[in-house]
């Protein structure tokens, strides 16, 4: 509440509840929501399969499996999805490991992809969020997609270095939003991937698996390098001849 007041948001514009989102969910009477933004804790422990009733919870049952007890990330994702309206969209900040790990997390990714809920995965630069230097991802879920593609955006190079952390400037955000809205492929930045490709890749949703990183290595001109080597070798040969001549001259004086 204090944070809301500090940002000049009047009390009648928000409703904050205290509790465990996963085991004591609030706002069930108010759902569904058209827009959800969430930054849940990364890879925290939760009761998971130790509570046999959770697998029948309407939020988790459709996936057929619960998020691992040691990593609740996908439990928060499924919670948000359940609260989303048929025309809604959710943006969830996630730990990057959930996009490629196997086991239950892979099965949940399969559920999300097979049901066409995954609109976009955005990888961000490290050290953007307070309290962590992790390069996190944003998972965008939608229940009103017009195709079955999954968009991947590599925004890991979009940041401005500040004293203690990195920041996204307005220009960076605008660039990401333009690519997100257009769904166009941009070299080294964004790619829309067919459903079949994601399936063939074992439902891996890691951005680096689909967006080729820019090669920052120096381009070497082999012909130019070879010419320089020949010139250097020629200079060395001439230097050896000069040294031999000097040595011979010195030895002649000694005689």
What are these regions (language model features)?
Residues 21-24, 28-255:
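A conserved structural/catalytic subdomain of Rossmann-like adenosyl-cofactor enzymes
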Residues 1-29:
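S-adenosyl-L-methionine
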């Amino acid at each position: 509440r204090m944070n809301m007041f500090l940002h000049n948001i009047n009390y009648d514009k928000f409703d904050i509840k205290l509790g465990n989102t996963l085991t004591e969910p609030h706002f069930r009477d108010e759902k569904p929501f058209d827009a959800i933004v969430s930054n849940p804790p990364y890879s925290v422990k939760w009761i998971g399969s130790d509570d046999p009733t959770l697998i029948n919870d309407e939020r988790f049952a459709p996936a057929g499996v619960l998020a691992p007890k040691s990593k609740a990330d996908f439990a928060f994702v499924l919670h948000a999805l359940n609260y989303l309206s048929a025309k809604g969209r959710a943006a969830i900040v996630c730990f990057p490991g959930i996009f490629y790990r196997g086991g239950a997390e892979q099965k949940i990714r399969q559920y999300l992809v097979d049901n066409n809920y995954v609109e976009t995965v955005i990888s961000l630069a490290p050290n953007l969020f307070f309290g962590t230097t992790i390069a996190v991802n944003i998972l965008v879920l939608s229940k009103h997609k017009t195709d079955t593609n999954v968009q991947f955006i590599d925004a890991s190079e979009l940041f401005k270095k500040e004293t203690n952390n990195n920041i996204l400037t307005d220009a960076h955000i605008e660039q990401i939003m333009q690519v997100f809205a257009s769904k166009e492929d941009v070299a080294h930045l964004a790619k829309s991937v067919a459903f079949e490709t994601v399936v063939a890749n074992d439902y891996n949703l890691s951005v680096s698996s689909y967006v080729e990183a820019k090669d920052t290595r120096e381009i070497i001109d082999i012909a130019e390098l070879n010419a320089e080597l020949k010139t250097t070798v020629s200079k060395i040969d001439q230097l050896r001849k000069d040294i031999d001549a000097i040595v011979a001259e010195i030895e002649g004086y000694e005689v």
